[in-house]
Amino acid sequence: MDALAPPISSSSAASARLHILILSDRDWTHPQGGGTGTNLFAQVARWLHWGHRVSVIACSYPGAAPVQRIGELTLYRVGGRSTVFPQAIMRQWRGLVPDADVVLEVVNGITFLTPLWCRTPRVTLVHHIHHDHYVRELGTTGRVAALALETLPLKLLYRRSRFLTISRASARDIAAHGIDPARIEISYLGVEHAAFGPDPAARAPEPTLLYLGRLKRYKRIEVVLDVLARNPGVTLDLAGDGDHRAALEAELDARGLRDRVRVHGHVSEERKLELYRRAWVNITTSSAEGWGLSVTEAGACATPSAALRLGGLAEAIDDGRTGVLADDPAELAEKVGRVLADPQLRDALGRAAHARASEFSWDSTARRTLQLLDAERRRAHPGALPAAGLEPMTHADGAATPRAAVGDTTPV
């Protein structure tokens, strides 16, 4: 891992350097880090750069060090994807990170039950409610799991908690769990503008769709294959990995689509950029999505997106301007076909998607989260100095931070 860049000097000496503890089921180095990992990585990199200290407690995975330190960042890895929750609670209760100023609890369908045991000021980050995810992955068993692990804890324990989420749709879903909307803040995900940008010369010569993300059942990638099957002469780049890959490989053979799909598996950041630039349309058909990070990343490369109209995707895509939304697979296939067949429409959507992506930056996202964390800290400690990084910054908003600088090894 490379050394971290030195912290930026605050424009005011009257500011505090915080120690932020993150509780998450996985960190950004995990092979299944996904959008959660990207979000945490981007924000943590900036908090460190602004002079703060960050500790993360997350699950372990094969080959991961139990403790990893770089500069003011410490990653603690305990338990597996299921056992990380009791392990993290027990280890933190015993004082693993005794001096945190504020806690960011990341809830990906399972809570850490922090209202029962955590006395440090805290904020709960929920990307999206996972009920549909549970049902899609586990059927009837998933309904019971969602009730026990997500629905009941949120309704019974978290009513007085402060929440952060990434779209209005997710905010509404959280509020439906009995949380006062006034306690829910929204901060859209950003884009690394220095890492993504258009290159018309890199566009594929033949009509090309791109799906980029984890290969999970709830992502409903079979619907992407439906769209492909209804549009002859189109190629699909399928980038990412996950436990649904074998089923998708079998589906390709069963449908006779193998020759029209390039299965890439995990891809590097460099390859991700190439795929975004090659694609004519970026497509996602997930059953649960808080925002749609691939939508804004593709947009930064002037590639329009297509999706089913649900969750945060209906906010990430401005239908008819930066991409297309549909209410069912048949309509999605028809709209995608129209975009692929009309170069003027496709170029107009791509230009608008690029302009829209420029409205989002990780600096803004990281600062908004830090504001909320600091507000909870100062509410518990009246008179405390504000956190460094909340005053006007001296560097360009949206500047990219090298992923290796915070130990990132995560492909898509």
Label the model's feature ranges.
Residues 287:
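Aromatic "clamp/platform" in nucleotide-sugar-dependent glycosyltransferases that forms part
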Residues 164, 200-231, 237:
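Conserved donor-binding/catalytic core segment of Leloir-type glycosyltransferases
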Residues 295, 304-307, 317:
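Short hydrophobic beta-strand element within catalytic cores of glycosyltransferases
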Residues 249-267:
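Nucleotide-activated donor-binding/catalytic signature segment of Leloir-type glycosyltransferases, i.e.
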Residues 142-163, 172:
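Membrane-proximal helix-turn-helix segments that form the acceptor-binding/catalytic region
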Residues 169, 190:
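Carbohydrate-associated surface elements
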Residues 319-330, 338-344:
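Conserved acidic donor-binding segment of nucleotide-sugar-dependent glycosyltransferases
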Residues 266-267, 274-279:
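Short alpha-helical donor nucleotide-sugar binding micro-motif in glycosyltransferases
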